[in-house]
Amino acid sequence: MGDSKTPLPPGAERYESFSFNVRLLTVMGVVGMVLLAVLGRTFYLQILQSSNFEERARLQQQRTVRLEPRRGKILDRNGRILAVSVPVGSLYTNPSQLKQRKRVAQRLAPILKIRSRKLVAHLKSKAPFLWIKRQLTPQEVQQIQKLEIDGLKFLPEFRRDYPAGELAGALLGFTGVDSQGLGGLEYGYNRWLHGEEVAYVVEKEGMFRTRPEIRDERWEFNQHTLHLTLDSTLQHIAESALRKGVKRVQGKSGVAIVLHAPTGQILAMANYPDFDPNRYRRYDAAQQVNAAITHGYEPGSTFKVITVASALNEGIITPTQEFFCEEGRFQVADRVIRDSRPHGNLEVGQVIQKSSNICAAKIGMEMKPAQFHDYITKFGFGAKTRAGLPGEAAGQVLPPEKWTRVDHATVTFGQGILASPLQVVAAINAIANEGEWRPPYVVEYAEDESGGRHTEFFNESGEVLARFGPKAPRRIIDTAIARILTRFMVSVTERGGTAAKVAIPGYKIAGKTGTSQKYDPSLGRYSNSKFWASFVGFAPAFQPVFTALVVVEEPPRPNHYGSKAAAPIFREIMQRALLLMDVAPETPPTVVVTRPATPEMTVDPATFEAIGMQDLD
């Protein structure tokens, strides 16, 4: 048979060759398609999606920490720094980097003044970025650096510093650890003091090993420095006198305010007990507030100036008209009104000088409730002064349609009305300004980072967001009437007045004492043992430079009178203020009195305008 091969059918070789070529082309096609897909994917990833992957890689390698910027300064009228942001270091870590956390905590604890056990628990966090303590002192930073502990890092931040400590603390307010204003001017003007936040980038390598930090350079953008009307020296004088005076009479608290009489600028605003914003956590909330604007009190006899001014301006009474003071006891409906001392007949000026409740009630009741209420509101009571101080209270004035006869009588001597100390001093400042009420204010202007001065800020719609500096005054009473009231108030500080000891050699002081009982909600009546003692006035009386008010809360008997608790503080502040500003001694005008023919005679205000400042004693 042999081994001869079976011959292939015709065309078989050509078929086998074709089949091989098809398979080869198929494989090559598949390989080509795969290569094309790979190349396409590579092009897509490396070219079209490169920025996206770079961003992902960056996010994996970096952590962005949002830090607060440097706040604008707060300066007094002479450019002295009251608040400033200083650079500090803040300690952070990635806990996974730390070895021997317990040992690290033990070494850090005494420096940071944190219990070691608490620090160990804190370092157990699994967060890749962990604050250990922020806003360290330079000494703390230096001590920690000397420890040379791997994994501990610092980021630069700013801490708010108040170089003068307690000076104007309640007025300035304070900021939190994130540089946000939490009280006082810091809170009220946070929008302008606070710049834009800073993006601070921390790069990571491997297991969050940090590379050198990358700093964003927007540290001082868009914040403003506030320039105040406050005078640091006068503020210190007011705080010192208030602290000493309240302690002397063993009072609970006190407030002192000094205005620049012609403009309404707030030169000093003191609170006792005082408050250091550098250590705000050590104080309770009651000590952090500015009682000069937030606390309402019954102004007592200081309000008699408003009563007499209103009646005189209406022409209902005359300056020398006499009123019978009922020998110290006057029945109004179911209420008995008393004077501290019995009086017979008193002229209007003597009602102020001797501070008669009974005659003040009789004068006030000569006016209709709506008529009197209108003057009360014109003098600024029942509404915020809009001095630019956050947290200001509007006070409380009962609507005239709700007045009873007792309400009508008692409001004349400052009972049944709530007012802030700032409202009272602003009202009396209207007398100093010959009948014009001038809005008090504390911010003169805001300065931007390029040195531009701003007295107004607007939103995108053109609405005013803030307005600084002086505002337009409004006339309340005629000039002649205001001058008469000034003379009446001068008699208070002269022989025979309730505050003769306030007199300062070389100057005429226009003033008024105030003593009011505190309402006790638990008793449902006025307390017989708790009082507000106050004194308000301006000097020099006939060319006023300063208007000031002192209020002392709860001075115990027998020092509960305004003449004993508040007047001595006022005298010390005013005397030192006159010396500080080098105010020349005043020579009072020579005046002549022409008495009316009858007590009922009314005097045209134009008459007093013509005769100027008259001595009506």
Where do the PLM segments sit?
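Periplasmic/cell-envelope proteins involved in peptidoglycan metabolism and beta-lactam response
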Residues: M1-Y280, A291, G296, K368-G382, ...
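Beta-lactam-recognizing serine transpeptidase/beta-lactamase-like catalytic domain environment
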Residues: G2-R14, A83, K204-E217, L230, ...
